[in-house]
Curated annotation (Swiss-Prot):
UniProt subcellular location: Cytoplasm
Protein name as catalogued: UDP-N-acetylenolpyruvoylglucosamine reductase
Boundaries of every FAD-binding PCMH-type domain copy: 15-187
GO molecular function: FAD binding; UDP-N-acetylmuramate dehydrogenase activity
Pathway linked to the protein: Cell wall biogenesis; peptidoglycan biosynthesis
Cellular component annotations (GO), alphabetically ordered: cytosol
Alphabetized HAMAP family for the sequence: MurB
BP terms from Gene Ontology: cell division; cell wall organization; peptidoglycan biosynthetic process; regulation of cell shape
Active site as annotated: 163, 233, 328
Length: 347
């Protein structure tokens, strides 16, 4: 285990903004995590677990211990009907999806190129193109950070919702995801109802065809974090009431929306685009010109630049549509998690 003091976080989050933390530890075993929690030097400090740092913005120096998950390994067993995968939490998610497809295991291909680690996937209940992690997840293994004992949670225990789970609520900061279990059906059924996947000819449909198309679309629309700092989709797609949608669609007949939970889920990228915000910048932070849902670090921006840009976008969408955008990216201040509303209120 490596432990660094007053460490730079620039290489540990995909926004690539220069920021620091008091301590940074890179762990490759559960015992490493237990030893950190038992170390008197760290017990009173705020702690934050990171995978690839692909969904986080450090708004200032983090005055605590950042723990980077590098628990690696995966195994496959099978039943008559399913492939059963056990995946360590530090495994790279895009590499896992590509490996599954190459091995002939379908069902996961819609989730190609979502940045991050396997251990982060259930926290966010990652999803794309009509598939969410909850559709594939059979269990999540966690380390209880109070008892320092491991346990297995069923998918039902995880209380998955839209970009949501029990790990953001009742179990927030109370456990560390060590591994996940995935169940991929041997009898493959395509999920091709969304966007560009509908254009794949029926006789060409396969896990690999969907995987290739998803990768193609993502690479065309989404900037590579290795080249342009970003955290993927910055805002969640908001869910509004049917009445609100009916009022809006009378004025905006081309509004992009889908039925969801007795309401309508509106495409946040469409809302931002319709406000004329593609390409707009605040210093070195920019709304991506190709995909308005992504905020990028195009010129050594500061966290303050990203916060100001996010605030501008949120306000513009509210003024035009009376829809409140909620950021999907986690904001971290000196002591732990915060949000845009709290930052705005303090200014």
């Amino acid at each position: 285990m490596q432990i660094k003091e007053h460490a730079s976080l620039k290489a540990f989050h995909t926004f690539g903004i220069e920021q620091t933390c008091s301590y940074l530890a890179i762990v490759d075993s559960i015992d490493d995590v237990i030893s950190l929690y038992q170390n008197p030097a760290f017990q009173s400090l705020p702690k934050l677990f990171l995978g690839k740092g692909s969904n986080v913005l450090f708004t200032e120096h983090f005055d605590g211990l950042v723990i980077v998950n590098r628990l690696l390994g995966k195994s496959v067993s099978e039943t008559h009907e399913d492939y059963l995968l056990h995946v360590q939490g530090g495994e790279d998610w895009p590499s896992l999806v590509a490996w599954c497809v190459a091995q002939g295991m379908g069902g996961i291909e819609n989730l190609a190129l979502i940045p991050g680690c396997a251990g982060s996937a259930p926290i966010q209940n990652i999803g794309a193109y009509g598939v969410e992690l909850k559709d594939l997840c059979s269990y999540v293994d966690v380390l209880d950070l109070t008892t320092l004992k491991t346990r297995r949670m069923s998918a039902e225990d995880c209380e998955f919702g839209y970009r949501d789970s029990v790990f953001k609520h009742d179990l927030y900061e109370k456990c560390f995801v060590t591994a996940i279990g995935l169940k991929l059906p041997k009898r493959w059924t395509p999920k091709n109802q969304y966007g560009p996947l509908q254009n794949i000819p029926e006789n060409e449909l396969s896990p690999n065809a969907i995987f290739e198309r998803v990768c193609q679309v993502r690479m065309e629309k989404l900037p590579d974090p290795a080249k342009v700092g970003n955290a993927g989709s910055f805002f969640k797609n908001p869910v509004i009431s049917q009445d609100h949608y009916d009022q809006l669609v009378r004025k905006h007949s081309d509004m992009v929306a889908y039925p969801a939970n007795e309401g309508m889920k509106v495409a946040a990228g469409w809302l931002i685009d319709q406000c004329g915000l593609k390409g707009i910048s605040v210093n070195g932070a920019q709304v991506n010109p190709l995909q308005a849902l992504v905020l990028t670090n195009v010129d050594n921006c500061s966290a303050d630049d990203v916060v100001a840009l996010a605030s501008l976008v949120k306000r513009a969408v509210w003024d035009k549509y009376q829809i409140e955008l909620e950021h999907e990216v986690r904001f971290m201040n000196r002591q732990g998690e915060t949000n845009l509303a709290k930052i705005e209120a303090a200014q």
